[in-house]
Amino acid sequence: MKMYYESDVNTDALEGKTVAVMGYGSQGRAQSRNMADSGVNVIVGLRENGNSWNLAKEDGMTVKTFSDAAKEADIIHILLPDEIQEKVYNEQIAPYVEAGNTISFSHGYNIHFGLIKPDEDVNIVMFAPKGPGSRVRTTYLDGFGIPGLVAIEQDATGDALQLALGMAKACGFTKAGVIETTFKEETETDLFGEQAVLCGGLTALINAGFQTLVEAGYQPEIAYFETCHEVKLIVDDIYEHGFGGMWKDVSNTAEYGGLTRRDYVITEETKKGMKKVLSEIQDGTFKKQFADENATDAANLKEMRAAEDQETIEVVGERLRKACGLQKDD
């Protein structure tokens, strides 16, 4: 494993260069502000008068259309949703990309799956924080940062790695450490983590536990606390201290019960399912399905979202969070 820290990196390669951050969502807003505060010349590319246009201006950023930002940029850092990157790149960015420019990402999806295909005379790089945009910004303001990844798909100028690491440092990532990877590895492991564990697997596990208790006659509110609410406490402990630290912090009853009963829940069949998830990422099945979904304006996804909102655990959870003063206004 190759890891880069503050002392390994300087931002000299960025001097005199303009970075155009395309998009101003959670990551776009955080990364552009961090780089600007670190002295990098940053402009933001957006859809004119879109939802983020005024917000970026209020934040003091220089805001331009995608095309105008691409014309001025030496480095084009694309932080748009995966499903619209290809269209925006081909129509509003690619016509203005010049030899020696750098095309940058924080997720390798569109490059790895061949949806965006820059010419051979430009750099293709990635620097990616391992955390949400809110943490990217708050840890930077606290004088630290969150861990990150860096990858080089194409080095046309000979200094692509220095450019990517310079931006990672300007965002604060090298204070925690930046691990070298590849676009393939980042894309496939990121998608797998989201689908099998973090977003798909975890929510399914929580809901199954909740339903098991409710179906056995326990109060839904108690079931929610025991299977959903307390997840954060355990995850925070693992985040800071690992599995070993978590086991030390819970009671002996919880430790013994967890270690002797977890195989009832996560079985070899579960692992077979995880391997299927990974296989469909690797062979392009998921990419095709996601593209087909977006071709229908995400009709199926919208139906699934609506169904999720009606799940008993969601109804009970919202009621409890409000009652306990835990729910923040959107």
Swiss-Prot record:
NADP(+) binds at residues 24-27, 47, 52, 82-85, 133. Mg(2+) 2 binds at residues 190, 226, 230. It catalyses: (2R)-2,3-dihydroxy-3-methylbutanoate + NADP(+) = (2S)-2-acetolactate + NADPH + H(+); (2R,3R)-2,3-dihydroxy-3-methylpentanoate + NADP(+) = (S)-2-ethyl-2-hydroxy-3-oxobutanoate + NADPH + H(+). Mg(2+) 1 binds at residues 190, 194. Residues 1-181 form the KARI N-terminal Rossmann domain. Its EC number is 1.1.1.86. Residues 182-327 form the KARI C-terminal knotted domain. The keyword NADP applies. Pathway: Amino-acid biosynthesis; L-isoleucine biosynthesis; L-isoleucine from 2-oxobutanoate: step 2/4; Amino-acid biosynthesis; L-valine biosynthesis; L-valine from pyruvate: step 2/4. InterPro entries: 6-PGluconate_DH-like_C_sf, KARI, KARI_C, KARI_N, KARI_prok, NAD(P)-bd_dom_sf. Binds 2 magnesium ions per subunit. The keyword NADP applies. Involved in the biosynthesis of branched-chain amino acids (BCAA). Catalyzes an alkyl-migration followed by a ketol-acid reduction of (S)-2-acetolactate (S2AL) to yield (R)-2,3-dihydroxy-isovalerate. In the isomerase reaction, S2AL is rearranged via a Mg-dependent methyl migration to produce 3-hydroxy-3-methyl-2-ketobutyrate (HMKB). In the reductase reaction, this 2-ketoacid undergoes a metal-dependent reduction by NADPH to yield (R)-2,3-dihydroxy-isovalerate. This is Ketol-acid reductoisomerase (NADP(+)).
